[in-house]
């Protein structure tokens, strides 16, 4: 389940449960974490730096992450086929 507090990006999308479970299995805390992942989507699109915060996809790169911001997440999270965790904070 994603966090009850709203994400810093009001346009954020919820990360599917199977990928949240993978993050926890690979060492991310269940709550209060930020993870940087490399994600492959259906069709072969590669996102180098997907930022996940407490179960929410909040950004597609590290640019402009300070404070509250708006960045459009331009894909359906259900189309994720592979996740590689680069960093967990």
What residue spans do the PLM features occupy?
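Motif-centric detector for short Cys/His coordination patterns
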Residues: 1-89
